[in-house]
Amino acid sequence: PIRLKMGQQTAGKTFLNLFAYTCSASVHAALGGAIETVSVDLSNTYLNWGKRNFALNGIAETHHHFIEADVMAWLGQCQEKFDVIFIDPPTFSNSKKMQDVFDVQRDHVELITLAMRLLNPNGICYFSTNFRRFQLDEDSMRYLQLKEISPGTIGFDYKRNMRIHRCWQVSPKEQ
């Protein structure tokens, strides 16, 4: 699964987990040696679950941060840079805590664009979705290198249905 990749690619790096849910990708990043993780989610309940997951894995919160926020609004304000960014948004959200309704099909270009602004040079971003009818708008992101890596990110117990989720590696195009 993709969260295992986070553990393999984050040693000595900073890691941002957007729509973090229970922070499993952040746990894997921390166990893989990330020097800092930042997990952002709208739900304090899920972030508290994430904190428990860190504790259960023996990881102190010292360099691992949990931010309750509307991801889109937070991305517009954040100034920190990260080496690895993981984006796993819901298909749809209309929470009262958000500034706007979120729709992954409609909003993914803006989401990825905002996240890429926070990526360090030579950094890497991963965008994942479980929306089965999702179509990546490559034309609107021609300035990025987009590589679909879905087959390598699906756990063995889900191999029978390769459309269970889709995942892309996103990086700036080589100049």
Identify the role of each PLM range.
Residues 71-74, 78-145:
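S-adenosylmethionine
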Residues 12-21:
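Conserved class I S-adenosyl-L-methionine
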